[in-house]
Amino acid sequence: MAELPGQIRHIGGRMSQLLEQIYGFSRRSLFRVISMGPIPCHIAFIMDGNRRYAKKCGLLDGSGHKAGFSALMSMLQYCYELGIKYVTIYAFSIDNFRRKPEEVESVMDLMLEKIKSLLEKESIVHQYGIRVYFIGNLALLNDQVRAAAEKVMKATAKNSRVVLLICIAYNSTDEIVQAVKKSCINKSDNIEASNYKHEDSDSDIEGTDMENQEKKIQLVDIEENMQMSVAPNPDILIRSSGETRLSNFLLWQTGNTQLCSPAALWPEIGLRHLLWAILNFQRNHSYLEKRKKQL
C-alpha cells in the first residue's frame, strides 16, 4: 500500500504528458488549416493589463508581470509554430519610468532575470533559433539590464530563423526624434565629404539638380535610421485588455496595420485571441495589400 501514492503520481504524470501531446497535435493540425490562408510576417503586441490582473486575482505586486511573462512565452511559441517570422513586444515604455521607484525597480529586476534566462539551453531562443533585438533608448536602463540585453543580442546575432524585437525604454516619439537626428548628422557628413571632393578637384561648377536633391533629407533617410528598420512593418498589432490606444508605440510603422483589442488582460491572453486576430487579418488581407501599394 505504501507504493500506491507513488504509482498514482506516476500515472498522473503519464496522463499529463498524454494530454499535452494530444493538445500539441490538435494545435498543429489547426495551424495547418489556418496556414491555408495568408499568414502575417510580423505581429506586434502591447502587453497591457499585468497590474490589473494582479489586483483582480489578489496577487502581490509584481506577480502580474510574472504571469504576463508566462503568457508571452506561450504566445511566442504559437507565433513561431505558425511560421510568423517577426514578433515585437512592448515591454517597457520610457513613460513607465515615471511610476513609483519601487515598482520600476521590481520590473527591472524581473526583466534582468528573464533576459538572462533567454541564454539558457532550454530557453525558447535556442528552441527556435531566435535572433533577439532590444529596441529603445538602452542608455536609460541600469548597467546590469543594459549589459544583459547587449549580451543576448551578441549571442543571438547569427540566428536567422525567426526574430524577436523587445521594445524596452522605448516610445515612438523618441525613436522618430533619434532617427531624424541621425539623418541630419549623416547628411551633414555626406555634404562635407562632397564639398571636400569638389575643392580637391578645383571644380567651380555648380552642383547638379541631383546633387542638390541629395543634400535634402528624404523619407528613406529617416526610415533607414529608425531602430525598427531591422523588421518589416507589422501586419497585426494586438493590444490586450480591450484598450484601443497605441500608447506611443510604433506610430511610424502602423499606418497600414490590422489592429486587434481583445478584452482579456495580458496574462489571460491565449491561442484563441491570436487565431481570431489572424482570421480577421486574412479576411481583410486583399484590402490591406491594396492600401500598401497606394502608399
From Swiss-Prot:
InterPro entries per the UniProt record, alphabetical: UPP_synth-like (IPR001441), UPP_synth-like_CS (IPR018520), UPP_synth-like_sf (IPR036424)
Known pathway: Protein modification; protein glycosylation
Top-rank taxon, per record: Eukaryota
EC numbers: 2.5.1.-
Enzyme class, spelled out: transferase
MF annotations from Gene Ontology: transferase activity, transferring alkyl or aryl (other than methyl) groups
Annotated GO biological process: protein glycosylation
Keywords from the UniProt entry: Transferase
UniProt cofactor(s): Mg(2+)
One Gene Ontology cellular component: endoplasmic reticulum
The keyword Membrane appears for this protein: no
Keyword Transferase tagged: yes
CDD domains the UniProt entry points to: Cis_IPPS
Role of this protein: Catalyzes cis-prenyl chain elongation to produce the polyprenyl backbone of dolichol, a glycosyl carrier-lipid required for the biosynthesis of several classes of glycoprotein.
The protein, known as: Dehydrodolichyl diphosphate synthase 6
Species: Arabidopsis thaliana (Mouse-ear cress)
